[in-house]
């Protein structure tokens, strides 16, 4: 019997399949569909920040020097927020404010909106990158879910908070000293340290640092020995196939130290994921509250008693007075466009704050 085989027709790839193959090809640095968002946005955000901190002044928006060109250093340079009069304008280069003039756009604070928006999309692109890569190699998506914590903080602080206030002016500028100034502003105008969401955020971040230190030390302490080297890195083979440390020994140690210990690796590592991510999300929720000018804890009874009795004072009432000093001093310096003038008797005296 003769069987005649015709040619098997090749399936023609359309443009989408061709692009998909190229984007998801196995290479040293994975690109993926998420890379179409991540790489351009990260490039523009970082490029805008380096350009702003090197060349662009904040004289027209804040009355400050903020670039290396003006004599700032790495800690004091910043890409500062637009002027308060520009409210929530996107400050597009071709918009009615700059009208295509790049120099004017920089003077008005256009680089800040450029860096903030591209930075936000770059972070989202990085999270999508983790989703995409995890899906392609059949991992669970907890890395991407965890990264939602930093994204929530960035979006709430740099975008949602100023949207709730009068303009981008009240967002943090992109610089080290500028962020410190913003923290002082948050304390003076919102009493942020006494906000329960801030407390949960601090507990989450510092608790995560403690968990990392404990976990790393415990694993190092309970490694199975498979060599006679004099130190950790020579005595243990990094390619060993079997389990690398003793969970049973670790459990026994911490049971004796605390009376309780994790007996299950999955629960232990989920807890290490849960603590910092929840802390960051709580902080983000708190900042959204501040955008709406929600107040922190107020212990009014202590304030009234302190006002009536000169001998009564608590750490809380002292902090309230400090906040008043921050507001009185900062408002006039920070918002020169408001022409705020405070009577001498209400201002803090000299350096003896």
UniProtKB/Swiss-Prot annotation:
GO terms for biological process: photosynthetic electron transport in photosystem II. Chlorophyll a PD2 binds at residue 198. It is a multi-pass membrane protein. It catalyses: 2 a plastoquinone + 4 hnu + 2 H2O = 2 a plastoquinol + O2. The D1/D2 heterodimer binds P680, chlorophylls that are the primary electron donor of PSII, and subsequent electron acceptors. It shares a non-heme iron and each subunit binds pheophytin, quinone, additional chlorophylls, carotenoids and lipids. There is also a Cl(-1) ion associated with D1 and D2, which is required for oxygen evolution. The PSII complex binds additional chlorophylls, carotenoids and specific lipids. Chlorophyll a ChlzD2 binds at residue 118. It comes from the Eukaryota. The chain crosses the membrane at residues 41-61, 125-141, 153-166, 208-228, 279-295. The modification Phosphothreonine is found at residue 2. One of its GO terms (cellular component) is photosystem II. Gene3D superfamilies: Photosystem II protein D1-like. Its main location: plastid. It is found in: Plastid, Chloroplast thylakoid membrane. Its EC number is 1.10.3.9. Pheophytin a binds at residues 130, 143. Signal peptide: none annotated. 2 of the reaction center chlorophylls (ChlD1 and ChlD2) are entirely coordinated by water. PSII is composed of 1 copy each of membrane proteins PsbA, PsbB, PsbC, PsbD, PsbE, PsbF, PsbH, PsbI, PsbJ, PsbK, PsbL, PsbM, PsbT, PsbX, PsbY, PsbZ, Psb30/Ycf12, at least 3 peripheral proteins of the oxygen-evolving complex and a large number of cofactors. It forms dimeric complexes. Photosystem II (PSII) is a light-driven water:plastoquinone oxidoreductase that uses light energy to abstract electrons from H(2)O, generating O(2) and a proton gradient subsequently used for ATP formation. It consists of a core antenna complex that captures photons, and an electron transfer chain that converts photonic excitation into a charge separation. The D1/D2 (PsbA/PsbD) reaction center heterodimer binds P680, the primary electron donor of PSII as well as several subsequent electron acceptors. D2 is needed for assembly of a stable PSII complex. Belongs to the reaction center PufL/M/PsbA/D family. This is Photosystem II D2 protein.
């Amino acid at each position: 019997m003769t069987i005649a085989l015709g040619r098997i027709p090749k399936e023609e790839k359309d443009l989408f399949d061709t692009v998909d193959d190229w984007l998801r090809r196995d290479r040293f640095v994975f690109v993926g569909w998420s890379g179409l968002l991540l790489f351009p946005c990260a490039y523009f955000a970082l490029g805008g920040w380096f350009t702003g901190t090197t060349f662009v002044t904040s004289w027209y928006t804040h009355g400050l020097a903020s670039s290396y060109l003006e004599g700032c250093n790495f800690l004091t340079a910043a890409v500062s927020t637009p002027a308060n009069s520009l409210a929530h304008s996107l400050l597009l280069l071709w918009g009615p404010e700059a009208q295509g003039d790049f120099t004017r756009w920089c003077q008005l604070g256009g680089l800040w909106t450029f860096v903030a928006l591209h930075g936000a999309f770059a972070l989202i692109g990085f999270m999508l990158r983790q989703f995409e890569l995890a899906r392609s190699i059949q991992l669970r998506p907890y890395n991407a879910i965890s990264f939602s914590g930093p994204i929530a903080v960035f979006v709430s602080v740099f975008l949602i908070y100023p949207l709730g206030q009068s303009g981008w002016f009240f967002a943090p500028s992109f610089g080290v000293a500028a962020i410190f100034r913003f923290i002082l502003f948050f304390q003076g105008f919102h009493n942020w340290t006494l906000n329960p969401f801030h407390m949960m955020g601090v507990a989450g971040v510092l608790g995560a640092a403690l968990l990392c230190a404990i976990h790393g030390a415990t694993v190092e302490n309970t490694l199975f020995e498979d060599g006679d080297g004099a130190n950790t890195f020579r005595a243990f083979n990094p390619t060993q196939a079997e389990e690398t440390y003793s969970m049973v020994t670790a459990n026994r140690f911490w049971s004796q130290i605390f009376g309780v210990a994790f007996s299950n690796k999955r629960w232990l590592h989920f807890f290490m994921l849960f603590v910092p991510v929840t802390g960051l999300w709580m902080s983000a929720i708190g900042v959204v509250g501040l955008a709406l000018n929600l107040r922190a804890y107020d212990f009014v009874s202590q304030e009234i008693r302190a006002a009536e009795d000169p001998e009564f004072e608590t750490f809380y009432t002292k902090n309230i007075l400090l906040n008043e000093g921050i507001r009185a001093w900062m408002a006039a310096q920070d918002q020169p466009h408001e022409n705020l003038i405070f009577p001498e008797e209400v201002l803090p005296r000299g350096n003896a704050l």
